Curated annotation (Swiss-Prot):
Naturally occurring in which organism (per UniProt): Sulfurihydrogenibium sp. (strain YO3AOP1)
Name listed for the protein in its UniProt record: Acyl-[acyl-carrier-protein]--UDP-N-acetylglucosamine O-acyltransferase
Enzymatic class: transferase
Cross-referenced Pfam families: Acetyltransf_11, Hexapep
Key words of the record: Acyltransferase, Cytoplasm, Lipid A biosynthesis, Lipid biosynthesis, Lipid metabolism, Repeat, Transferase
Entry GO CC: cytoplasm; membrane
Molecular-function GO terms, alphabetical: acyl-[acyl-carrier-protein]-UDP-N-acetylglucosamine O-acyltransferase activity
Length: 271
């Protein structure tokens, strides 16, 4: 049974699943789908072309499916898709995609967005990911699975953050953050592997050892990234994790965030 508060405005064209609850003063427009057992708290606005999965919880003041903040947007149909078991805390905003990408802004399953997170047009956020308070994604940002981003962190348009990475709070991300790594500071630097996260996710000691060696070669000792890639391919076994790391760095368009120790050496040389 669907429960809709008398003060809520819900279009009779919207598709609401079993046991959906809609709180006071919330507005749900025509072209909206909401899965079973999802809870929409008070004063939420869900606009056209939005699809929300099952067992989600959307807290007070969220606005989902608003048009993108993109000067090239001409009113074309585009979408927001949110997976199952995902939580958006107070005052999150999620904008629709644009024709400059695939037209979809997507948030995965089992993902947790804390208060005041902003997800801009065409972003992709993976499964089991946590974005802390006031994380701000510019357009076309891609964040993988099992990622944690600390609060008050802005992420530049088109940047990527790979699976199992961790970004410290109040960082400024203007380069790609490879999978399995730990990054922080303004502007963002790499600080080794996300060892705590990898152990929590059950990665073996052998896998972590290989990733440490790949990290050392790619980001600390090789004169260039291209030389580091070649050395890793020649010296290390082609495990799934090593291949994931190589695929990520090979396809960077924004560039990879600098390694902290290299950055310190560069500053010393300049001084």
């Amino acid at each position: 049974m669907v429960e809709i508060h008398p003060t809520a405005i819900v279009s009779n064209k919207a598709k609401l699943g079993t046991n959906v609850k809609v709180g006071p003063f919330s507005i749900i427009e025509d072209e909206v789908e909401i899965g079973d057992n999802t809870v929409i708290h008070s004063s939420v606005k869900i606009r056209n072309y939005t699809k929300i999965g099952s067992n989600c919880e959307i807290f007070e003041g969220c606005v989902i499916g608003n048009i993108p903040q993109h000067l090239g947007f001409k009113g074309e149909i585009s979408y927001v898709e949110i997976g199952n078991n995902t939580v958006l805390r107070e005052y999150c905003t999620v904008h629709r995609g644009t024709s400059f990408d695939d037209g979809i802004t997507r948030i995965g399953n089992n993902t947790y967005l804390m208060a005041y997170v902003h997800i801009a047009h065409d972003c992709k956020v993976g499964d089991n990911t946590i974005l802390a308070n006031c994380v701000t994604l510019a357009g076309h940002v891609k964040i993988g699975n099992y990622v944690f981003v600390g609060g008050l962190t802005p992420i530049h348009q088109f940047c990527r953050i790979g699976d199992y990475a961790m970004v410290g709070g109040a960082s400024a991300v203007d380069k790609d953050i490879p999978p399995f790594t730990r990054a922080s500071k303004n502007h963002v630097l790499l600080y080794g592997l996300n060892l705590v996260g990898l152990k929590r996710r059950g990665f073996s000691s052998e896998t972590i050892k290989l990733l440490k060696e790949a990290y050392r070669i790619l980001f600390r000792t090789s004169p260039t990234l291209a030389e580091g890639i070649k050395e890793v391919e020649e010296k290390l076994p082609k495990t799934k994790e090593i291949q994931m790391l190589l695929d990520f760095v090979k396809t960077t368009k924004r560039g990879i965030a600098p390694e902290a120790s290299k950055r310190k050496l560069l500053i010393s040389d300049e001084e």
